[in-house]
Amino acid sequence: TMGCTVRYVIGNHDYVKGKYGEALYESIYGPVWYSFDVGNIHYVVTSLQTGSDFKSCYNKNDRWKWLKNDLDKVDSNKKVVMFNHTKSPSDDFVLSFGKDELDLKKHNLIAWIYGHYHYNYVSDTDGVLNISTARPDCGGIDSSVAGVRLVHIGADASVSTNMIYYSLAS
C-alpha cells in the first residue's frame, strides 16, 4: 500500500519468551541481520545487542564475524548506511569485539539510523549522520510530537531527512 519495500529492524522488546529471544521475530520478519544494495549504497541491518527482555541466541562473536564478512565483500566505492535498534556503541564508529576492531568510517559509513531512545534527533559526527526516530504512534519520550521520519538517500549518497508531524488527538 505504500508503494515501496518495507524492511524491519529488531528492537529490544522484540526479544520474547520462546526457544530464544528473537525466534518469534525471525519467524515473522526473517533474519535479524541482513544487507542489501540499492545503486551505490550498501544498507546493513544489524542487531548489536545481546537481547533485552529475553536473551539472544547469538553471541558477540557471531555478530562480529557476520558484520566483518559482510563489509569486506562491499565494493570500496559504495557508501554504507547502518540500521540498528540503538545508536553506535562508539562515538567514532569503531566497533570493538574483544581485541578486534572494525572502523565503519573506513567502509564509507554515511549514516547510522536507530530508534531505541524514543526521540527525534539528527546530528553530524565527522561526516556521519546519526538519525534517531521516535515511535510514530505516540511521539517521543522527550515529549516530542508524534510523526514519521522520511529519510532520502540520493544516488550521489546525499542524505536528507525531515519529519512529518501529526496530532494524535481524536
Language model feature labels by segment:
Residues 161-170:
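Short, solvent-exposed aromatic-acidic interface loops
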Residues 17, 89-93:
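Short, solvent-exposed loop/turn segments at secondary-structure junctions
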